[in-house]
Curated annotation (Swiss-Prot):
Signal sequence segment: 1-18
Extracellular side: 19-649
Protein name as catalogued: Semaphorin-6A
Subunit note: Active as a homodimer or oligomer. The SEMA6A homodimer interacts with a PLXNA2 homodimer, giving rise to a heterotetramer. Interacts with EVL.
Gene name of the encoded protein: SEMA6A
Segments traversing the membrane: 650-670
Membrane topology: Single-pass type I membrane protein
Chain's role: Cell surface receptor for PLXNA2 that plays an important role in cell-cell signaling. Required for normal granule cell migration in the developing cerebellum. Promotes reorganization of the actin cytoskeleton and plays an important role in axon guidance in the developing central nervous system. Can act as repulsive axon guidance cue. Has repulsive action towards migrating granular neurons. May play a role in channeling sympathetic axons into the sympathetic chains and controlling the temporal sequence of sympathetic target innervation. (Microbial infection) Acts as a receptor for P.sordellii toxin TcsL in the in the vascular endothelium.
Feature: compositional bias, Low complexity: 937-952
GO biological process annotation, one example: cell surface receptor signaling pathway
Record keywords: Cell membrane, Developmental protein, Differentiation, Disulfide bond, Glycoprotein, Membrane, Neurogenesis, Phosphoprotein, Signal, Transmembrane, Transmembrane helix
Amino acid sequence: MRSEALLLYFTLLHFAGAGFPEDSEPISISHGNYTKQYPVFVGHKPGRNTTQRHRLDIQMIMIMNGTLYIAARDHIYTVDIDTSHTEEIYCSKKLTWKSRQADVDTCRMKGKHKDECHNFIKVLLKKNDDALFVCGTNAFNPSCRNYKMDTLEPFGDEFSGMARCPYDAKHANVALFADGKLYSATVTDFLAIDAVIYRSLGESPTLRTVKHDSKWLKEPYFVQAVDYGDYIYFFFREIAVEYNTMGKVVFPRVAQVCKNDMGGSQRVLEKQWTSFLKARLNCSVPGDSHFYFNILQAVTDVIRINGRDVVLATFSTPYNSIPGSAVCAYDMLDIASVFTGRFKEQKSPDSTWTPVPDERVPKPRPGCCAGSSSLERYATSNEFPDDTLNFIKTHPLMDEAVPSIFNRPWFLRTMVRYRLTKIAVDTAAGPYQNHTVVFLGSEKGIILKFLARIGNSGFLNDSLFLEEMSVYNSEKCSYDGVEDKRIMGMQLDRASSSLYVAFSTCVIKVPLGRCERHGKCKKTCIASRDPYCGWIKEGGACSHLSPNSRLTFEQDIERGNTDGLGDCHNSFVALNGHSSSLLPSTTTSDSTAQEGYESRGGMLDWKHLLDSPDSTDPLGAVSSHNHQDKKGVIRESYLKGHDQLVPVTLLAIAVILAFVMGAVFSGITVYCVCDHRRKDVAVVQRKEKELTHSRRGSMSSVTKLSGLFGDTQSKDPKPEAILTPLMHNGKLATPGNTAKMLIKADQHHLDLTALPTPESTPTLQQKRKPSRGSREWERNQNLINACTKDMPPMGSPVIPTDLPLRASPSHIPSVVVLPITQQGYQHEYVDQPKMSEVAQMALEDQAATLEYKTIKEHLSSKSPNHGVNLVENLDSLPPKVPQREASLGPPGASLSQTGLSKRLEMHHSSSYGVDYKRSYPTNSLTRSHQATTLKRNNTNSSNSSHLSRNQSFGRGDNPPPAPQRVDSIQVHSSQPSGQAVTVSRQPSLNAYNSLTRSGLKRTPSLKPDVPPKPSFAPLSTSMKPNDACT
């Protein structure tokens, strides 16, 4: 069972490591408002004018023998670490080394800027106990000197710094002294083409790497040099020669050279390294496809952790990619093991790099130091065989890469916009000096503080993110308004518990721990898990713990257990990435804060606090001694931590119930909204359907007169009405002899854009006329048509047309025949006294009945059998009505506002031609006079008849407008005579001076079909005597 559990654990660990780890959050955060209290060095001496400043251009800092050395441009400053500093750090000594004017002039002649033609100190080493070795760029002419450590006075001769110091301050270089010899790595020419790892000084011969050989070095950037055992290790990054086909791929490298290397023979590798080997450093996130951090930024010296010698290195992504940084740890034994592995070679310039088989490796093995256990018979490297020397010359690259501990980064930082560039380690942190704390510096002036936790195997397997600090002081470090936040170097001094952080314009002294921020809050002090801080029981405050402290204190570095400790109200330390409180901690604001807290039941009055004249910035500086005198600021309940937590089961149930209730509520809301919309749509559709049916029943017979003849409103105050040709005067006769308006004119807006405009057709007044019903009306018309069938037509001019005369059962007749006497005209066009609509309707009904009886008697007297049969047959036959009508008069005709009278004259001649003629009389006669004229015409001719139906559209005084065109219809008769029947319509052009005897009454249609071409014929007023049906 135990073995299965272990197997499951390692499987889960493997899968957990396969994914990309997330960034850890800091326990504590210190912003710039708090760290600006730290002392700053800007190049001043004590007692001097502090307002004057000059550009420092700090290149590096070092701590030697309790003294901080600051290497800058043209100067070296020393600072006594033991001297306490409050606001500003003053230098104790200052060394000035400026370039000679001749070197400056030469530098300017080579095209360099005057700011570059200075002496930038790039090498500052302790040569021995009494001397310093210093090298500078010296206006692109590197030079080196020796100085006394205590007085900073030069001694000895100045010598060339070529291959020891770079020409340009921007170029990277490393150097160290080992066994009295200087090992340096830099460039040796003005153009920085020849990169070299160089050994000089001392009794050993000068050695260097092979010149202009990309297999040895290809555009390297040197980071660190480490002395370990029999070798000197150089850490750098360069363009990977084994990946030339993929472009400029940069790999981190580690190279080794033997300390006792004396160079090769006179034939091979003379005055060159015979032990130079290099290998790749692997710092990547494991997975199916490894994610590599290839830009090496900084490397520590060899440090000892739990009995193992390791180096810590910071890596980052390329500068043209997304920012990301990682810290990897390497065991020195792993590095040495790689250099004893297989070599890598390229057989041809176009081939890939492959491992070299072991049988091809010569003896003695290349890369070993002379006099070692495997090369005891070779006292010096000059005695190596040529095969060994030739092989090491062409095969300096190892096949395998140096793996990091646990094959994964020790720390990752990928969700930020900066890269980690510097590193400093305290391997004896805490009161018992048993913890390892790492400080990482970034290019944005931010320092990250980590606790290195050691696993059971003795290797680094986890890290604890303790603190994040923003230490750059913009007020004191900016120069000419420019803020350069890149960290140039970090030096840790364990004796003073300080970390010196160097920028290009200043140096800031940062305490290793910020214990005073916790004040008298025990919970935050323990939860910070800072090895430098502890809860002092005697003073009841969180204080810094010095090594071998005899004070009684409490710490919990491994777990940070705070069970039973109450919350604090006077701490703004961020725990687990979140600020626990933002209450101020300065002495001047404590009383004000306490008063506001007590008066409001535990809530601090921030407005009162900020408005107080004695208050300071809530995020301002805090002194460590201010918290010792505070009273009544801490509120601790001493409740068990688990009592304040919510059970996971209850939390899960609450979440599920909240989700279900939200889903139900959402469903009900959606249903209600959809149902409401569905009802609205149904109501709209029902209304549209009813409106469609009403329109369909009225459109074929209803005409909007106001839209047809113009937009001018009638003078009659009565509302406008739609007129129908089937009902007299637009009114519907009801059994009660009451007239009703059919349809209001403003209820329908007909599309009459194709009809004449108001400019050509004046406005007509509308009126309605009662009707006796469509069925009775049709019988009367059929009887009248029957009585005129056998009568000879009256001679009149006929206008021919090609349009046939058709009748359709579904077509509402627009041309009907009515017997109209001359009294009808008088009724329509002569001003009469107003009478009620009921009286008018009764009078018209009597006239219609009289006409019907007269026609019937006439038919019976003329031809009894023929007339009766004809009358009976016509009751069931619809009238023959032309399908196209509604000709309009010319625009220039004189119109009247009294009403519109349309009449068609029908003449029977010997050729049986029927002529429909429309005329508009100007004079109206009485009905009795009309009847007399009709009887007189019947005595002259019994075969001709003129019947007129008068449709009045208004009660105005003026005559109706004349039509604009004439439709002529010619019908070929089927009678034996072979004569044609012609129906014509034409306007009256005689200014309405004569009145026709009888005619056909036409009604306007709603919308005429395609009109024929207008044709005009002279109006003939000569008529033959006709016989009217009596």
